[in-house]
């Protein structure tokens, strides 16, 4: 999925699109084209959401890449207040890698969170779950 997102965003070459991730690396294609639009926050999920919300409030599109369940659980209050508050109508924040999809089975139970979609639904956040990365 990372390579697909990296190529997709890199080909768009759009200054209004940002990628924020939590220590996920492998976004070289997009980063080469838009070095100021890729932000690695490390494993600080609440900060990832706060930064994404601030950028989205400036009418930018923000892709948040990480283990979605970790982001949803660790930053739920920020999502509830920021994403569903002032940022939702000014920009779009797109969380990637939702649901227990098998991507991180070797990383242990902490990476296999299966209720992130239900938590998003509780906040009336639209969720889409494609079955493949498209190559």
Q: What is the predicted role of each segment?
A:
Residues 1-135:
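Thiamine diphosphate
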